[in-house]
Amino acid sequence: MLEYTAGLIRRNKKKFLISSGIIGVGYYVTKTINNKIQEFQNRIREENFAKEQIKRRFHQTQSDCYMTFLSLLPVLCEPIMDDLPVETITKQLQIRRLEKQIGNKDVKNSGSTVLSDDFSTSQEGAISEDTNKPPELKSKNQLWQELKIKAITRFLTLIYCESLLIVFLHLQLNILSRKSYLETAIRLASETQGIDLVDQESNGDFSGNTQDENLSEQAFLSFSWWLLNKGWLEIKNKIEPCVEQHFGGINPRQQLKINEFAELLNKCQNCIDLKVLNLTEEDIHLGVGVIEDQSQPVGRKSTNFITNALLPPKEFEFFLLQQTNDLDFLSRFNNNIVNTESLNMLLDELNNYLNNADINLIVNKLATLGITKVLDEIVLNLLQKNRPNPISDMNIRDIDLNDFPPYKLAALLANITKQSISLTNNSVENPILADLNNLPELNDLSASVYSNFDP
């Protein structure tokens, strides 16, 4: 039997060798293919996981942007409300009206809070003034003129400053979030796969301690101080002449239809867009703007107004850090030149974004949306008084405003004042602010910043 088997092998040796080779090659190929498939599946899972991580962190960053905006809103609004004291002027008009009604008897000791027909009790509680200091004596007409200009100026200043703050924070936090994610991903790849990768944004410097890196990021976040304390005044000074131009000649007792009032606000906005955003009506219609020369010299000086309103000149940067941080922070920050270099890189990138024409268009869309939402609320408030059935904001677009009677400008100013106060409400449930934060173009901007991994 053994001889027969040995003879069979000798006679078919070549066939056995070929068969064994085929089986061996087949096994190797099959194993290789299986390994490649396994690697491909693992890579797909890793990519999907990475995409989910990026998506999750992106959405978390947008939520952080909104919560940061709400936390800074009182800081932004307080000086604007103080600089444009509409309620104080209203108080003086109330006193004048009361003096006339009761024959100027014991008015100063009455402490009355009676309001005129044109201003509702919604303004109570917003007045903060020194009662021991007598108000400046002005005629009733002067007070009404001042009230008219300040009420509309304050409303538009709040809208534009809040729009700028939203954009500024979305740029800041998405730059930092992308930077943090990229550094984490590179560090993990280096540790788990032994790959020597260089993060071009940090010049491959992973030897510096995390604490120092956090110092530059903290300093970067401090730069919102400029808009909150300086920039808003620049915005207000651009807005007030536009309001004077289009509302200055209108008597507060003059009657206007709602669409006429909206048209006046639109003219003011066009004037503001030209002065603040350097946008004409044609630019807005075409969706284009003036692109700032981004090859800026050292110092980041810019002729773009909103950039100058949002970022300080180079020589004031350390002053800003002094205003926003304690001495211990400043000492630790200055001890390492890398902190200054890292901060400058972040500011340069932010400056480049702010000088892009798309930013001006987004600010315009935010302001337009805010003004539109406020006008919708005013329409609802006015129409609810004259209609027994409630009107929702869902069917307000079906209403023909030409069918409704005109209102005194004073009544419209009262509603503008009421809505201005609502713009200072930093509740998460504030519908107007939520709509601003959910503007699609703002989300697109955030996505483009977050996904920009170019050096």
Curated annotation (Swiss-Prot):
Q: Copy out the induction comment.
A: Expression is induced in the presence of oleic acid or methanol.
**Phenotype reported upon loss of the gene:** Leads to a peroxisomal-deficient phenotype and mislocalization in the cytosol of peroxisomal matrix proteins. Affects the assembly of the peroxisomal translocation complex and impairs the interaction between the peroxisomal docking complex and the peroxisomal translocation complex.
Name a single GO cellular component: peroxisomal membrane
Pfam families for the chain: Peroxin-3 (PF04882)
- Outline the segment boundaries, as ranges, of region: Disordered: 113-135
The yes or no answer to whether the keyword Transmembrane helix is present is yes
UniProt KW Membrane keyword: yes
Which GO MF term does the entry hold, naming one?
protein-macromolecule adaptor activity
Q: Where in the cell is it found?
A: Peroxisome membrane
The biased composition feature labelled Polar residues covers: 113-125
GO terms for biological process?
A: protein import into peroxisome membrane
- Segments passing through the bilayer: 155-171
**UniProt KW keywords:** Membrane, Peroxisome, Peroxisome biogenesis, Transmembrane, Transmembrane helix
Top-rank taxon: Eukaryota
Q: What is its main location?
A: membrane
What membrane topology does the annotation report for this chain? Answer: Single-pass membrane protein
Please give the function described in this protein's UniProt entry. Answer: Peroxisomal membrane protein required for peroxisome biosynthesis. Shared component of both the peroxisomal docking complex and the peroxisomal translocation complex. The two types of peroxisomal matrix targeting signals, PTS1 and PTS2, are first recognized in the cytosol by their receptors PEX5 and PEX7, respectively, which then carry the cargo to the peroxisomal membrane. The peroxisomal targeting signal (PTS) receptor-cargo complexes interact with peroxisomal membrane protein (PMP) components of the docking complex.
Q: How does it assemble?
A: Component of the peroxisomal docking complex, composed of at least PEX3, PEX13, PEX14 and PEX17. Component of the peroxisomal translocation complex, composed of at least PEX3, PEX2, PEX10 and PEX12. Interacts with PEX19. Interacts with the pexophagy receptor ATG30.
- Spell out the family assignment given in the record's similarity comment: Belongs to the peroxin-3 family.
User: What is the protein named?
Assistant: Peroxisomal membrane protein PEX3
Species lineage: Eukaryota, Fungi, Dikarya, Ascomycota, Saccharomycotina
> Gene name?
PEX3
